[in-house]
Structure formats: C-alpha cells, structure tokens
C-alpha cells in the first residue's frame, strides 16, 4: 500500500547511514526517475506534437496537463508558469529545468552527483563521464533542440546514453 511504501521510504531517509549503500540507493533512485521521465516523454510526445490541426483545444491542453500530472510536475510547473499552459514551456520545463526533481536535466545532474560521490576523488568513473557529458548537453544545448524540432531524436539519444551509463555502472561496480 501507499502508506507502507511511505513508511519504508521514511525509515530509509531518517535512519540509514549515509555511506556507500545509501549513495547507491540514491543513485538507483535517481537513475530510475530520469529514465522513467524520458520513457514517458518519448512515448507521449509524438501524439502531442503532431502537425495535425488542434480541433479540440480543451482536449489538447488536457493532454499536456495530464503529462505534467503523470510526472508529478503539475504543481511545480504552475509555480513557475502560472495557469498558462504552452507546449513549448512544458517541454522546456520537463527537459531542462534545473530546479524540478522530475526534469531530465535535474535527474541527470543528480545521477552525476551520486556517481561523483561514489567514485574516488582522483578517479572519474566511466559511468560518471557518460552521465556528465549528458548533463552538460542538457545544460547547454537543449533549448535549441526544441526549436529545431529534434526533440524525439534527442530523447532517443538520452535513453541510449542512460543505457550506456547503466551498463558501465554494472560493469564497474557489480562486475556484470
């Protein structure tokens, strides 16, 4: 149940020692969250950004609102943009907002931060390099992709890089 899950999460957050085990737990949580966000965006966006005329505007905006709600971002979006719901703003928010825990940029940065804390100070791991490059792309070149209509191919690229990071993480830390 939801209550049982929240009790477990609370126990972990308030009692677990902040050692390597906790860092790996947070790394896995962050990696799963950013991966899930990208998969949902990649699945939903083709229908939302189609070139077909928007005949039923209430339905059109309801779909964008549902996307935000499904990613637990509607309230955060409204704090930034108010009631205005523009697709370009939603995309920029979900992909590139540095303060929103469910945005792709925030998620990639969180994964990178956890990897950096796990890695030794003198040795940057292969997974950290992969995710670091992805985080930099999300920070510095992402907005142009929306304007150029390359968002779906960029999401495919993000999924590929997250997969590479996962494989490298497994190889480096778990020997598989």
Question: How should each PLM-predicted stretch be described?
Answer:
Residues 1-176:
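Alpha-helical transmembrane segments and their helix-helix packing motifs
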């Amino acid at each position: 149940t939801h209550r049982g899950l929240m009790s477990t999460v609370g126990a972990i957050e308030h009692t677990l020692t902040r050692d390597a085990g906790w860092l790996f737990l947070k790394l896995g949580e962050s990696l799963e969250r950013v991966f899930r966000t990208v998969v949902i965006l990649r699945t939903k966006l083709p229908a939302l950004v189609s070139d077909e005329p928007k005949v039923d505007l209430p339905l059109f905006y309801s779909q964008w609102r549902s996307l935000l709600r499904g990613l637990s971002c509607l309230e955060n979006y409204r704090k930034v943009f108010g009631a205005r719901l523009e697709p370009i703003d939603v995309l920029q928010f979900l992909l590139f907002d540095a303060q929103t825990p469910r945005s792709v940029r925030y998620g990639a940065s969180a994964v990178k931060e956890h990897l950096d804390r796990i890695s030794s100070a003198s040795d940057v791991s292969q997974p950290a390099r992969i995710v670091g490059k992805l985080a930099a792309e999300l920070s510095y070149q992402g907005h142009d992709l929306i304007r150029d209509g390359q968002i779906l191919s960029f999401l495919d690229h993000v999924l590929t890089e997250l997969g590479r990071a996962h494989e490298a993480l497994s190889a480096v830390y778990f020997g598989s």
